[in-house]
Amino acid sequence: MLTPIQNFLKQEAAGGILLFIFATLAIILANTPLSYLYFDFLQTPVSVQIGAFIINKPLLMWVNDGLMAVFFMLVGMEVKRELLEGSLSSYQRAVFPAIAATGGMVVPAIVFLVFNATHPEFQEGWAIPMATDIAFALGVIALLGKRVPLALKIFLLALAIIDDLGAIVVIALFFSHDLSPQAFIFAGIAVAILITMNRLKITALSAYGIVGIILWASVLKSGVHATLAGVIIGFCIPLNGKKGERPLDDFEHTLSPWSAFAILPLFAFCNAGVSLIGMGMDNLTSTLPMGIALGLLLGKPLGIFSFCFVAVKLGIAKLSEGINFKQIFAVSVLCGIGFTMSMFLAGLAFGGESDSENVTALARLGILIGSGFSAVLGY
């Protein structure tokens, strides 16, 4: 089972380096005289209409709501495989990364809320520092080469997968609004078809793609965030086919390069462009970016390491062979690279605010600071 995991880790690491390049390019463009071209590009209107059904959104939203659904589909497939036969397939395997992920979600959120206790207008962003960008973190680890044992990389992967599950639950519970019963009915029908296809062990990617698009459009109109459709599709892809084939692995092999080398870099390019023009120390020291930055930089390692340490000392879990607490601490610092998922959650948290552009810019500034320092210190 290590071969697909090793392939996944290698691809995510390469994608993480590309993420860094595109994020840097976005920051540069957003702070040059050509910044208006960059921001106008993000707001380019794109419409799709079929009869009376129409979706009209700016390009930025198509990336965040549409292309990111493919990324979450891959997350769903990866979670399913790891739950059935991978690093999360038994209590003994799952308990240690699960405890680590719990600490890595709870403590950063607490740090953020402590910093923003007197600023209720910012408290919607409590989930932002909970996230870990697995591609970025693995990209940093890749720079260390063979000095990092495979067991530690698998621990990081399992932790990040559970972290993603936590983010999915947060999105479903706290970022749903203006629910539409009619759209839910169409979404329910699409899910029923996907489950039936899974039971029949249908392995055609095109079939799941067609039903998946219907599900995505229905979820988009339902008021629940559309990326959750991707997770559902991922869970419905069968692990094994009728003739011994591996459709889930095949689909992941087909889509992973598109996600790692196109979707996530494009997402980074569209979301990392924070204009620093006109920002002063009062912006940098605002409780919003400080809460996010310290949630990632301090909350993540404190939560992950302390929860792991206590769990081992109490006998609830044990360290994997070849891993020590020093390595766990280093990984916990790298988990403070929230970048992609934190940017995504920031857009959900503050997208509806009247002063959303300024608030979101401050949130992204905090993400960049916290993620940047975490990458440097973790390395």
UniProtKB/Swiss-Prot annotation:
Domain of life where this protein originates = Bacteria
By its UniProt entry, which Gene3D superfamilies does this protein fall under?
Answer: Na+/H+ antiporter like domain (1.20.1530.10)
Q: Which UniProt keywords apply?
A: Antiport, Cell inner membrane, Cell membrane, Ion transport, Membrane, Sodium, Sodium transport, Transmembrane, Transmembrane helix, Transport
Report the record's Gene Ontology biological process terms.
Answer: regulation of pH
Q: Which Pfam families match?
A: Na_H_antiport_1 (PF06965)
The reactions it catalyses are: Na(+)(in) + 2 H(+)(out) = Na(+)(out) + 2 H(+)(in)
Cellular-component GO terms for this entry: plasma membrane
Q: Per its UniProt record, what InterPro entries does this chain match? A: Na/H_antiporter_dom_sf (IPR023171), NhaA (IPR004670)
Specify the protein's topology with respect to the membrane: Multi-pass membrane protein
Compartment(s): Cell inner membrane
Under what name is this protein listed? Na(+)/H(+) antiporter NhaA
Q: Which organism is it from?
A: Pasteurella multocida (strain Pm70)
Cite the source lineage.
Bacteria, Pseudomonadati, Pseudomonadota, Gammaproteobacteria, Pasteurellales
